[in-house]
């Protein structure tokens, strides 16, 4: 028996040490990796994130709210509804465009995050709050609705004007017992690493760029979500009409409530850098340009991040978007907030 256990240990011990070593490695790099690196399990090194974070604002200047019934009880200069670009995506809340918006405008800024954001899209949430009387000119002067490009078409096509109440999570024994979502443990990330790398299921794509656009160890390499080249293409006439109808419904609802509406389109990382990809094998993405054409009569309500940030990339400014993340950098957040401030009332 003893001999058998010794023989088995020669096989099991190296595997066990491999898993433990990889778990320790992934635990060590977790805090200095962006969302792309955590998904793709590619380390960008602590120096890169440290250099980006050295330019953050010293604190968070905006407030968060997840209960729509409380919006009526307070007033704010700017209410923001959005996705991860408005909720700490990138390097956290201190680097959000919303934080720069609050700091540099001198307005009270509130970010509304529904208790279950998966129930609705930013435009749907905005319409429901306006249409159901949760907000108007007496408690909200300006409303910023931010949407990331890759989900825009699907979200708009699922838009409805028929909600009679704000969608909420159905309380069941399972939801009541559910614990808050946490970051994957190192061991779970080992499982993901093996699955992605052995079976080719890595959700992160890699492309060679014609010139450096990032700082760090791979300045001319682009990592981006595979969804960036799967969603937002070949918009059918029916989908185009649904997109326009969604925008017009929200614009009309804001106008009726006396709220100044600002629409922010957060460009996909692939879209803004697609022209720099060497021998680009992926299709051209034109949704930003299409939206500008379709919504020409209301263009003054829009802030297109691609239009704001592309000139800086052309001028050679690095890290307009983060190398290790799908979001733009804190420096770009400041540029975006400046454009929004120009449209505030």
At which residue positions do the language-model features occur?
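Extracellular glycan-modifying ectodomains
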Residues: 1-345
